[in-house]
Amino acid sequence: FLPETRKGENEVFWTLMLDYLGFPSLYTRMVEVNLNGNIYKAIFQEDATKEFLERNDLTETVILKSNDFFFYLNKEEKKIYNNLFTSSFVIDNNNFLKNDISNFIASEAIALRANKDFYKKVINEDFFTTIHKKYAYHGLATINRKYIYIPYKKIFVPLYYDGNVQFLPGKTDCQKKANIEILSSFEKDFKNLTSKNLTRMQECVLGDVLHLSNNKIIQLRNSFPNQTLDNKKDLKYENIK
């Protein structure tokens, strides 16, 4: 990606911070590209693959996202799409579909994704939403939301994608400080990924988000599905066209 499309080093900062918080996070760094003698900086970000999942201590499973096809249609095309098609989901890592078992897991994930109470099945969704509303609101758009399905628990883990990360004046509490050891480690990792030092604002955001995370993040191993959830389908998925 070109840096200006994702706020440059802020994208690297955000994915690294999510990793520190314990969220699965796509490996992201700044790289130098030489295209026919034209040298420029770009953002490298890994794909959501089996290797990504395993690096985050997750067994290979399905990653769901909403179908963003509708986003690219013109006004007339959208009318046709609304009349003839139902909202659908896309398997982000389609290489996962290898056999009947993986097909079943994907089908189960899609069925659960269509539930009215879906967001209650997403671990740490409230905290994830809170910090993205504050600093990376674009990442909460329906077409940018991705979810890793954990079949043996029947819950989902949020996966950040394309948040257009912005640190606007007046939104950050610079009174909150990150632990010295954490800050030192984070600064080292950030410099390795960007060849730049943390800015004062980035340091403030790190301290603020780490403070917000206190006693808010549930570890996957300690999370279990809520058996009282309503399994009724969201209305927009009930009428299959």
Regions found by a protein language model. Give the residues of each.
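A short, charged
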Residues: 1-13, 17, 75-88, 180-206
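Active-site acidic catalytic loop and adjacent metal/ATP-binding pocket
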Residues: 118-159
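Conserved ATP-binding subdomain of kinase catalytic cores across diverse folds
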Residues: 1-81, 133-136, 152
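C-terminal catalytic region of ATP-dependent kinase domains
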Residues: 136, 148-241
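ATP-dependent phospho-/nucleotidyl transfer catalytic cores
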Residues: 44-131
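Active-site-proximal structural scaffolding
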Residues: 7, 11, 26, 121-126, ...
